[in-house]
Amino acid sequence: MPDRTGLFGRTLAAAGTAAALALAMAVPAAAAPSTVEQDVAQLYQDVTDLYNGLPADALRGVDRLIESPIPKIGPRSRAAQGPIPGCTEGSLLTYANQLAAQLTPLENQAFDALSGLSQLYVQGVASDKTPQVFGTDGQYTPRATETIDKLRGFWDIESWNIQLVAWKGTDLGSQAKMAQTFSLGLAPAKVKDAAALATKVLYEVPALQGGRHPLLTLNAFSAPAGSLGGKRVALGDGLLDTVNLLGFDDVSVESVVGHEYGHQVDFAHENHPRNESSEMGPDAYGGYFVAHAKGFAWNSRTQQEVTYLDASIGDCFHSHGTPDQRKAAGAWGEKQATSQGNPNRIVPSATMIEKFQKEYPKLMPPATDQPAVAAVAAARG
């Protein structure tokens, strides 16, 4: 007699298997990370390890023009508090935030890693001993060269060793340059693979545009003598492209380099304010320089354009100064140049610092929130 029970059991087993397969097809398991996702995650870890391996004072005192919307690996100076009521951030910051908002989480992580990596390259490896090319197509090189030459002869500080270097996202495509960068703090055995991975990610994530996406280098910074790479000013291609897009191309290079060199003036005199005057002071010094007869001697219309550029990088976080405060600081500096009795006299840098520190309280609203003031000071360390 046939074993009907066994046949029935096998039929049920077959049916169960079919049902299980159908269920598996209907509710797929979580997809494994793609190769690109794995690459980006590994690169992010490599760059994090690189930053963690840097000397303790490598990034100390480095002043960035803006706080990038990309949450870059490394220290950030924005105060940990909400925005100032009634304040609207400057147009350049608004544009940068709009660019960042378009990124996917994967793209954001890739930008985070590569932006941090590119800053370390331009700070710790790049040198003005090799020809520097400013602008995505080199279009700003003559203006940048003229500006740094004028600044070195304008302010009475040691200037021969202040480098002006180009910050270019396309440098990320050079494995040799990235190997030099990773060598600053990554374990030697990991350097070669990390450098190769950086260039691979640069080209396998289309949003990066091979290093030409402005967010990668939408900034400038000034570094003091004791930091990684020594005294230097870095000027980002992405920043120059964005300033051009916003209509400030006529004054972009001179204003930004003048501002960043203003930080060198502060560094030279050990002036390290723990408030917004740390950025507004260089606005004032830069305004004085571009309006002065021995600087660029720009007319009133061009001076006004400079103050609007100052305003475009104003923020609303008790960090770098609001748009109105940045504009006022730049205008104050310009007025010092145009109203002095002898138009050819250059005020000593120490005197300019002292004069601005006396003016600074007039540019700020009354300090009604003492806890907030304390928080700003704490954030600046």
Model-identified regions with their sequence ranges:
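Secretory targeting and sorting signals
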Residues: 1-32
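A metal-dependent hydrolase signature that marks the N-terminal structural subdomain at the beginning
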Residues: 35-208
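Long, well-structured alpha-helical subdomains associated
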Residues: 36, 291-381
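Stable alpha-helical elements in mature extracytoplasmic
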Residues: 140-151, 249-253, 257, 261, ...
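Extracellular/periplasmic catalytic domains that process cell-envelope and extracellular macromolecules
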Residues: 224-229
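Short pre-active-site segment immediately N-terminal to the catalytic Zn-binding motif
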Residues: 238-255, 271-276
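Catalytic Zn2+-binding segment of zinc metalloproteases
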Residues: 260-276, 289-295
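Active-site metal-coordination segments of metallo-dependent hydrolases
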Residues: 270-283, 318-321, 325
